[in-house]
A protein has these predicted regions:
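Hydrophobic, membrane-embedded alpha-helices of multi-pass small-molecule transporters
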Residues: 73-79, 89-153, 175-195, 288-306
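C-terminal membrane-solvent junction of multi-pass transporters and transport-like membrane proteins
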Residues: 221, 260-337
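Hydrophobic alpha-helical segments and their helix-loop junctions in multi-pass secondary transporters
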Residues: 30, 64-89, 104-109, 149-156, ...
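Transmembrane alpha-helical segments of multi-pass small-molecule transport proteins
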Residues: 2-3, 27-49, 63-74, 104-115, ...
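Transmembrane helix-loop boundary segments of multi-pass membrane transporters
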Residues: 22-36, 52-61, 164-179, 185, ...
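Loop-to-transmembrane helix boundary motifs in multi-pass membrane proteins
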Residues: 192, 205-240, 287-307
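Helix-loop-helix connectors at the membrane interface of multi-pass transporters/channels
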Residues: 1, 16-34, 123, 194-225, ...
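Membrane-interface loop-to-helix entry segments
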Residues: 34, 38-39, 43-76, 91-92, ...
Length: 341
């Protein structure tokens, strides 16, 4: 699961590089590949400096980005939507509904690794209930509102998915460059967070198995540098087929992250009921051990349960063809949870 987390962070880092390619080119006269490389390099520098810078930048960019998106929403909604866009009498389309639910589930459950990684930095007096609701509502509102805005912008711009920065900046006239800078900095922040998270996942694998208590800056530089390099190469390789690439990684999250989320939820709420020996989680010889064979088998069965429902650009399963969309998150959530309990 940690390896899957690592891969997911790398793939999203690559996706951000592609999305910001044209935004970088609007400031600097460079080619496509160079723009992606520059974006990856700056992301690496911020990520390497560390958590404190990422956290402070995130707080600032949350406020600035929120204002930018609010202004864009107000201006965009002043334009008429396409005829029939809000017509609820078109009939119910199961395929469209199932696809929307799957993508929403993938995005929401994919937020889990961020919560797990960074909730550990919270003060001890912050309750689990507070952590849950602030994380959930932040994810729901942050993603949901921006997705709704993206749907509106998609009716106005043909290239909004591949070049959202220019679409957003176009609303600000002579201030478009300022708006573009804010958009780029906002994506830089989450990109550096992705790289930092990938580094943490990679180091947790080795430190957990070897009982390491400290990671040197040299090791951090190498691990994060290799991660940034991998993400940049993937971005360069997929930049001209981005929509299929991003759709695949969004759906693929379901196959690998949801079964493990199901195991964690079942363990926390139904088996352990929130009672853990935290110190032993950091000890390879503790009561939890290095790994649990039966749990890993359950996880793999959970992954296997998604195969008959998979729907990707290169593979369409039987049930995906029948339903018209991927609903693999349902067995991915139910099967491992039932087996674990």
């Amino acid at each position: 699961p940690l390896l899957i987390n690592y891969v997911a962070f790398i793939l999203f880092t690559a996706a951000n590089g592609v999305v910001m390619r044209d935004a970088i080119k609007s400031f600097i006269d460079v080619g496509d590949n160079t723009a992606i490389i520059l974006f990856g390099l700056v992301s690496f520098i911020i990520g390497f400096i560390g958590y404190e810078l990422i956290h402070r930048l995130g707080a600032i960019m949350s406020a600035l980005s929120g204002m930018i998106f609010l202004v864009v929403a107000v201006l965009a909604l002043q334009n008429p939507l396409p005829v029939g866009a809000m017509d609820l009498n078109q009939g119910f389309a199961l395929a469209a509904f199932a696809l929307t639910v799957t993508q929403a589930a993938s995005w929401t459950l994919g937020f889990g690794p961020y919560v797990a990684d960074y909730s550990r930095y919270l003060p001890a007096n912050i309750s689990s209930k507070q952590t849950f609701w602030f994380s959930y509502l932040g994810n729901l509102l942050g993603a949901g509102l921006v997705m709704l805005l993206g749907a509106v912008l998609a009716t106005m711009f043909t290239d909004v998915t591949s070049n959202p920065g220019n679409a957003i900046a176009s609303f600000f006239g002579p201030w478009s460059k300022v708006a573009m800078v804010i958009v780029v900095l906002g994506v830089l922040e989450i990109n550096s967070l992705n790289l930092y998270s990938a580094y943490m996942s990679a180091m947790t694998i080795f430190s957990g198995m070897r009982g390491m208590t400290r990671i040197s800056r040299k090791v951090k530089f190498i691990a994060m540098g290799l991660s940034a390099l991998a993400a940049t190469l993937i971005a360069i390789a997929t930049q001209y087929d981005f929509n299929a690439y991003f759709a695949d990684i969004l759906i693929a999250q379901v196959y690998f992250l949801v079964p493990w989320s199901a195991v964690n939820l079942a363990d926390y709420y139904l088996v352990k009921k929130g009672k853990y020996v935290v110190e032993d989680m950091y000890c390879a010889d503790g009561i939890y051990g290095k790994y649990n064979v039966s749990t890993m088998v359950i996880y793999l069965i959970g992954v296997a349960s998604t195969v008959p429902f998979m729907d990707m650009s290169f593979y369409h399963s039987y049930f995906a063809k029948m339903i018209g969309a991927d609903v693999s998150w349902v067995p991915a959530l139910i099967v491992p949870a039932v087996l674990y309990v």
